[in-house]
Every structure is written in structure tokens, then in C-alpha cells.
Amino acid sequence: MLHPVTATHRQTKNPGKSPRKKLDRRQAEELAFSDAKGPFDIIGDVHGCLDELLELMAALGYRVERRAGKFVVTPPEGRRLAFAGDLVNRGPATPDVLRLVMNMVRSGQAYCVPGNQDVKLARALRSRNARGKVGGLLLSLEQFGDEPAEFRAESARFLDGLASHYVLDDGNLVVAHAGLKERLHGSGSAKARKFALSGQNTGKIDKFGLPVRYNWAADYRGSALVVYGHTPVAEPLWINNTVNIDTGCVYGGHLTALRYPERETVSVPAKAVYSASRKRFLPARVTSA
């Protein structure tokens, strides 16, 4: 029997604390800045992997029931979820993942930031035209094929309305899909949104034909813990005061959550390889003779 994997990371360095930035009205509309101190359970890239999401939530102590087509969630006392984006595409159950997350966000049980895949799906749902769509996006549109038009529109509105990143716990915690440089924390600018969604490319292409991303975490010296995903890694990756929790569930890896402020990660294994990764990040599988 497979069991959730847990690990704890202790902060070894305490950078000088940066002052909380004052936001203007426009920025406040774009950015969710909350004094909520948690505790939080932050979940990495789901990519439509509903079964693994439900298993991970159970491991974290959340009880989920489905009643009349709706998800009803009972969280552990005092805890809230936060989703680090890329809820959708590539996996087997994108519509139901959205049903679950939308319900939790609207009931005040969860926070959610968008990922680049969420933005792509919202745009495609609005267009109602699958022509030219390929791969994981096409799969999601096919899954939405039997859904009512009202739910398609509701899903697009939800994804469109997500703030680019969250600043939580009085500035001590930042959740952004692709991470975020310190100087962009608390910014509602287009530049901050673009970075939070997709990061920053160096302009180079690697041997797999993929753009090489700027390693912003290596230069990060901020006091806020930044929790992000976007680039799959074999196990949670701690660099300075940041952690990447996209452990590639949709590619056959794990779905991971970070418990905050405990700094403990909890992971459940993927039940299948739902999509092929162009770039290997998981160890080679060992097969018996």
C-alpha cells in the first residue's frame, strides 16, 4: 500500500525583513493581500489529476464528499488550502478539479492563483473553438464537451478573475505559480502578473527544444517564503527562502503540498502517467527482470 510521503525543511537563514508595501486601489483589485496567518496547505500543479488531489487532501486532513454533483469539503480546524496554479490541462479530470476548487474558493476555504495553463484554458473556453488546439489543452476542451454552456462560462470567469499572486501572513508568505522576484511582491503591474504566470526566459533554448528559464530563486534574498510550481522537479526543491512544489503528478511523479508554517511537505504518488514530459526530470524507473 502506498502512503503519503512527508518531509520537513528548516529555515537556516533569516534575511532582513522587508517592509510591507502599501498598495493603491488598482493594485489591491489585482492582488490578494491578506493578513490571514494560516495555517495553510499549499498544493502544487494539479493539471486535472482529481484522484491524486482527493488523496492528497485526505492525507492533509480534509474530508471531501460529493453531493448532487457538488463537492462538499470539511477542512481541519483553522486550516485553509492555497492552490499554486495550473489546475488544468493534460490530466484526466479538469472539469471536476475546477468544480472542487471553485467551490472551496467561493466558500472561503481556499485561495488560488492562476498558472499559464489556466489562462490558456480560460481563453479557449471563451472562444468555443477547438480548432488548432493540441495536446493538454485539446484534452481539456474535449472533457468540457459534455458540460453545460453555463459551467464553461463559469469556469472561464473564475480563471479570469484570479489574482496574479497572494501575499499572506502579513507579508511572510507569497504564493505565485512561477515564483516572484522580491521587488514584485505586492505589485499589481502587468510585469508582476507575467512573471507570476510564466517566469522569465533567458532567450536560450535547451537540447529538448524548450526555453531556458531564468533561475530567479538562486538570486532571491527576501524574507517572505515564496511557494511556487510551474517547472516540474523530482522532489520539492528548496532554494534560499523559496520552494518549488511542482513534483510532476501529471507526468507520473507526485502531487505535493507544503504545510505552512510547519514547512513540511506531503506528497502522494501519481496513479498513472497521464502526459509525456519532453524533458526528463524523474529518475529512471527500475524494472525487475
Task: Show the residue positions of the predicted features.
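A short acidic-Thr-Gly-centered motif at the start of a beta-strand
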Residues: Q27-A36, V73-P75, V101-V105, Y166-D170, ...
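Active-site neighborhood of divalent metal-dependent phosphoester bond hydrolases
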Residues: P76-G78, R90-N172, E182, R193-F208
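N-terminal active-site segment of His-dependent metallophosphoesterases
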Residues: L2-L98
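Divalent metal-coordination and catalytic microenvironments
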Residues: D45, D86, G115-N116, S140, ...
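A short secondary-structure junction signal
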Residues: A178-G179, L184-A190, W238-N240
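Active-site-proximal beta-strand elements of phosphoester/diester hydrolases
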Residues: F40-H47, L173-G179, V243-I245
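Active-site environment of divalent metal-dependent phosphoester hydrolases
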Residues: G48-D51, N89-P92, V119-A122, E182-R183, ...
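Acidic, His/Gly-rich catalytic cores of divalent-metal-dependent hydrolytic chemistry
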Residues: H9-R10, N14-D24, D35, K194, ...
